[in-house]
Amino acid sequence: LSSKLNSRSPAFTRIELVVVLAIVAVILVLSWPAFKNALTKRDLTQTMNNGRELYLAAFRMATDGAANSDSNLAWPGDYPVNSLAEYSSRLVEKDYLKPADLQRMLSAPSAACTVTATGSPVTTTLTGKSTLKIYKVKRTDPSNTIFAASSNYIYDTELNAKVEPFGDAGFIVVRKSGDAGVYKKGQATAAGYDNNAARFQAEIGALPGATKGEVASGDGATVLAGPR
């Protein structure tokens, strides 16, 4: 009798192992969406922090320019530049950011941007995809003007699930005041604020040069061109 029981034990062990593995697989499948969502929220928060760090460098440069009447130190919209690379050159040349720090700020797991700075005066080259885009904010723009946003967001436009980074999982905005936030897809347009344009501009932000209480979809020419 003992020999029969011993001969069956390995079989029972294998069956139990298969059952346990099947249960684990089911748990993993069911928990994956929540796990993926948690990772995305983490990456969005990190991107928001990176955007605010970039904002602080821009703020210091513009403030120094205003204090010293130096037009070489200004907000992005007060320069005759049209690309993020050109504006980045100003930040690096004036030593408000190091190339390695800028590269970290402009990158995310699904959007890596490589920053190369050469020459004197410094010329900065950006390759890949920037996770952040910078708006042409001017000294005269109000504090709720958008300074930066994640690259998947187009002003007052629904998020596209196919656009990296983050798809339609959410987006980030950093305003000229320094306030920043992570937002859900339902907050991407004025429709998410009962089509109250003034409220949308107050909570998400306004485009550079925008009229208070008037919202137009799209970024238009208000964004510095990113790497291609």
What does each model-found stretch correspond to?
Residues 1-7:
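N-terminal secretory signal peptides that target proteins for export/translocation
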Residues 8-39:
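N-terminal single-pass transmembrane signal-anchor helix
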Residues 29-86, 227:
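Conserved hydrophobic/amphipathic alpha-helical signal-anchor segments
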Residues 31, 47, 69-74, 98-110, ...:
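A structural signal for short, well-ordered beta-strand segments and their strand-loop junctions
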